Amino acid sequence: MVIVASSNMLRPDRIWLCGKYQTARTLYVVGNKSKRRNPSLEDWARSDSDRKMKLQQQEYNRKLKELKNLTANVSKMISKKSEKEVERSQIQSTEPSPETSTQLTQKNDSQRLDFLAKKSLFIPVVDIPASVSDRIGLAFKYLVSKSSQNWSMVLDQLEKNGGFKDIPSKDIRKFVYQIPKPHIPPIISRLKKMHHDAGVPVSPKLVNVFIDSLLLSPSIPSSVMSQIESYCDSIRSTSKKGRLPRETYELLIRAYGKNSNLEMVNSILTEMKQVGLQPSKNTFENILATSVYKSKDHKQAVEVFDTMKFLSDKTKPAERAYRDIIVSYVNNDDIEKALDLYNEMVENKVEVSQQIMVALARGCISRPELKVKAWEFIFEIYNQKWEPTIQTLEYVLYLAAKDGDVALCRALVNKLSETSSVTVRSFSFLLLGYSKSSLYNESPSIPPILAHENGIRFRRNILADSSYAPSSESSLPFLPVLDLVTEKEILAESSAMWAYANTIRPDLINIESANTYLNIGAKFGSLKEFLDRYNSATLLDRQGVPDTRVIEDENLAEVSVMDYTSTASVRSPLLDRNHTLKVPRDDMTYLIALKAASKARNYEFSQEVWSERGLYRKSDRIRLSQEQKRTNLIFNLQSLWSQL
């Protein structure tokens, strides 16, 4: 083993520590073992660097060409300037006097304004057929404006004057097309009744408008799905052989996808094939999105994407399909394939979006050798001058949390709180940052964000602009320091955050945030600290546990805790109240509890956890769960059990 001294970190003789520059020498320990390398990732990084150099050269050539064109245009402008001056002198001799010209202009303007003022009384904000607007009258202009739209009262006015009677079907459709989709669901029944009263059948095109307006939410409940199916049945009853229009089939596929009913999606695809309809690109995109986000079936998602690529030119994947399949590969821990698809997009000149950059950054952060690359994708969003969304900022927070950069995590959440944008996800990522703090590592590393010049500026600016003084009673309870440099500070602030969520923002609490909160106690606190969090934040859901077994009320706080490092836990006084929210424990909760028991070498507590987990496995909660991740967790639990 060789010990090497160095003083080159970030700046010649300084390192970043706790938000301040301090003079230090750095000792690097170089081991004899060679580091594992990933050739495919190294080749990708090299090819990506070459690609960027080519793009820079192309950009230089483009700017040079623009400069030459500008020079030529300026020369032409100068040569034409004298010709225009000659023409102007000739025109001036035939122009009327300034007084006459002013009088004519004022007269014309006055006539035009009078005409527009009269005409504007009959021109609504939304362009609807004259046959409909004549019945509604001038009230339509005031009922539907840029600031507000009251379509229910519009229908009231229309019904008072005869409704849809004697109005052509084409005009009725044009009128309904002008109603924004979010306003349609509450008035569908009235529109159908007005058709019935006028003796006009509801056309399939209008039924499609009704169905489309019901698909705006991310998921579709069974009650809405039944309503959509009834609309489709009405179309089948009036069509030849009971077939539906292509647009209706595609809407049904999207609806069943949002209803997580893949069986019916396949049924509709089969029916389309039977009637000779080839699925369109939009249909494939909807099926792909369902496979990625609803059923989480990666294998099917890959099959759908490959079908789109090779079926025909009309179905070739665009940005949406690439985005969804990249997310699927990232979710399945295959960042290498996701990066290949990104290169494919660049080579084929497929538009790249902010969401794709975020997904790639999320995937790269899971590989130590790609952590710097993760931040490159984030800063590419700023290079493209895209306005970062809340989701993007949340994943910037996620990268900082995975890096163990607690100072940056706190600053980002503080900024989100200033605009009341703290969500369940960002709250969980803040807790993740606490649990990943570099204080837990024996040799703290420099955050990968500092490998970028943009990263250095970004981190410095956001830390300098952060103030942790509370501005109101609902402010997040940060400690008034730039960074947390001791385990006690991390325990104290995380406890304060949990108390804040309990008292002010209970919507921030779920099983993921609770498990991360427990993990902080397991890593940085004593077993007493962990037990305090374990009992106050979680509970066993006993629903469905067999009644034949006698279960005693256990009090895990009374377990003999073999901990000689601390006699008191670090907790917020607000958590001393008895009405704190508790979430049902899951497999991950018991895994963390066993780790805490293993760390403290407490056999009694580990037995208690293992026994309770047996009850949990017999509860309704676990029986009704559809997740297929339990095998790996069981293996981890058995491995930990053997260590105790």
Swiss-Prot record:
The terms describing its cellular component in GO are:
mitochondrion
> Where are PPR repeat segments found?
245-279, 280-315, 318-352
Concerning Pfam families, the annotation shows:
PPR_3 (PF13812), PPR_long (PF17177)
Presence of keyword Transit peptide: yes
What residue spans carry the Polar residues bias annotation? 89-108
A Gene Ontology molecular-function term?
mRNA binding
List the keywords (alphabetical): Mitochondrion, mRNA processing, mRNA splicing, Repeat, Transit peptide
What is the protein's major site of localization? Answer: mitochondrion
Localization annotation: Mitochondrion
A biological process (GO) of this protein is: RNA splicing
This protein's transit peptide sits at: 1-38
Q: Where is this region: Disordered?
A: 78-108
Q: Which Gene3D superfamilies match?
A: Tetratricopeptide repeat domain (1.25.40.10)
- What's this protein's family per the entry? Belongs to the CCM1 family.
Summarize subunit and interaction data from the UniProt record for this chain.
Binds to mitochondrial small subunit 15S rRNA.
> Any idea what job this protein has?
Regulates mitochondrial small subunit maturation by controlling 15S rRNA 5'-end processing. Localizes to the 5' precursor of the 15S rRNA in a position that is subsequently occupied by mS47 in the mature yeast mtSSU. Uses structure and sequence-specific RNA recognition, binding to a single-stranded region of the precursor and specifically recognizing bases -6 to -1. The exchange of Ccm1 for mS47 is coupled to the irreversible removal of precursor rRNA that is accompanied by conformational changes of the mitoribosomal proteins uS5m and mS26.
NCBIfam families from the UniProt entry: PPR
Further information in the entry reads: Involved in mitochondrial-nuclear incompatibility, a major determinant in reproductive isolation between species, through hybrid incompatibility of Ccm1 and its interacting partner 15S rRNA between yeast species.
Output this protein's name. Mitochondrial 15S rRNA processing factor CCM1
Species in which this protein is naturally found: Meyerozyma guilliermondii (strain ATCC 6260 / CBS 566 / DSM 6381 / JCM 1539 / NBRC 10279 / NRRL Y-324)
Output the lineage of the source organism.
Eukaryota, Fungi, Dikarya, Ascomycota, Saccharomycotina
